[in-house]
Regions:
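Phosphate/nucleotide-binding beta-alpha loop and adjacent structural elements of enzyme active sites
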Residues: 1-255
């Protein structure tokens, strides 16, 4: 009977497979490339978060997912696009001890030009100012804050985990967050495998890895991958960095 049922559904273009349960949290069977699974595993291995910082918070999707995994953590959201203000306000109203800043982040406090993409997800600070784009509403001036100043002024506590997804501006954000190195346990950074023509100046994946290694942070996991539409080549990946001598790397055993 099973054979005939499978044949019937195959003839309709469907394939029947047995659903495999998700491997146990923290096991070596967990798939690579899934952000939520990495966060669950970090928590399982002992990561405790009082404050999580989301730089490039966009519509708060990542923060909402992370809040489900670390329900007692407070959040600091940094996002420069006015279109996201309502989402940021809703998040902070729903989770009252969280805070948001409607600004970008960089090496110093400043005013810079943000180039807006149609999907509002790929907006970047890297392209140079262009009068034509500004007149078309595709560029605008935004305020830039420095994360070190947020910490030293007491506006936020030291984050335990920082995620940065800012379309090639990650290293500039980190240059303004020097106080976090050595204290923040985990960084999750978007990196690129190409120097894209449409966003000039994107740091290479090697640049990001070396920058973090110089500050005693090493690769721990890869929670996300993205192929480019042009030809399907792997173009971006999220890298989880942890302290080189931190508790997450306490053991160097294989088994």
């Amino acid at each position: 009977m099973k054979y005939f049922i499978k044949k019937f559904f195959n003839s309709l273009g469907f394939e029947i497979k047995r659903l495999n349960p998700q491997p146990q949290i923290g096991s070596d069977k967990r798939p690579v490339g899934q952000m939520d699974l990495l966060l669950e595993d970090l928590k399982f291995r002992g990561l405790k978060c009082q404050l999580i910082m989301d730089v490039g918070a966009n519509r708060t999707y990542w923060s909402r997912m992370t809040k489900r995994i670390f329900p007692t953590a407070n959040f600091c959201l940094i996002e420069p696009q006015i279109e996201m203000q309502n989402d940021l306000e809703i998040f902070c109203k729903e989770f009252p001890n969280s805070i948001f800043f409607l600004a970008g982040a960089g090496e110093k406090e400043d005013t810079l030009t943000l180039t807006i993409w149609d999907d509002l997800a790929g907006s970047s600070l890297l392209p140079l100012p262009n009068n034509k784009l500004e007149n078309e509403g595709k560029q605008r001036k935004i305020n830039i804050l420095k994360i070190d100043n947020l910490i030293s002024s007491g506006k936020i506590k030291m984050p335990n985990l920082i995620k940065i997804d800012v379309q090639g501006f990650e290293l500039e954000v980190l240059k303004g967050a020097t106080k976090t190195f050595g204290d923040t346990e985990v960084f999750i950074l978007e990196t690129s495998l190409f120097s894209f023509d449409d966003i000039p100046g994107v740091p290479s994946i090697a640049d990001v890895i070396n920058f973090m290694l110089e500050r005693n942070y090493v690769i721990y996991d890869f929670p996300g991958f993205l192929r480019r539409p042009l030809d399907g080549a792997l173009a971006q990946c999220d890298i989880c960095f942890v302290k080189q001598n931190g508790f997450l790397r306490r053991s160097h055993k294989w088994k």
